[in-house]
Amino acid sequence: MKLSKRGEYALRALIDLGIASELGLPMLQASELAAKEKLPVKFLEQIFMQLKAAGYVESKRGKFGGYSLAKRMDRIRFGAVIRLIDGPLAPIRCVSQTGYVRCSCPDEVHCGLRMLMLDVRNAIAKLLDRYTLADIVEITLRKLRRDKVTSPFLSRSTKLRAVLPPVINRQENGQPKFNSVGSTSRKRRK
């Protein structure tokens, strides 16, 4: 799996829409997002069309229009978005669950390369399918707040820690929620 520029921009745009939503901004214009992320507006609009067709975002025309999330953030999984934009997560097609194509190997069942790539595919899918937009927005806002960084979506110079409620660590299925990708929150023991 290689994340294309289109896939990267789609994920960044969704994260920005999620942050804006959490800050109480109902919509963002494509030009505002493009300026923040330093992306071509036309390319971003094409990505939004694809995300809109899949039901991830909605748009409103007019002076106060723009884009907003069409689904709850906890219903948007990163693996699904990447599959939509870039296709299968598998590094080779013969291990893909969504775009399987038989490889040229004469004995696919006993192919060592296929077994290795299947493990790679499963690890990637497990990680990307575990994270929701809500998780990543929470992690991002926590870091912005901790570092006392002003949100790029607030025109005034209000610090995030004055705007945001404290973030509480949640647990899912007895497992700690991630504070940042790949690290869990743990209290120090004396």
For each feature predicted by the language model, list its residue ranges:
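Short amphipathic alpha-helical interface segments
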Residues: 10-24
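Residue cluster at the C-terminal edge of the helix-turn-helix DNA-binding motif
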Residues: 53-56, 84
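Beta-hairpin "wing" of winged helix-turn-helix
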Residues: 55-70
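Non-DNA-binding regulatory cores of transcription-related proteins
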Residues: 70-163, 178-179, 186-190
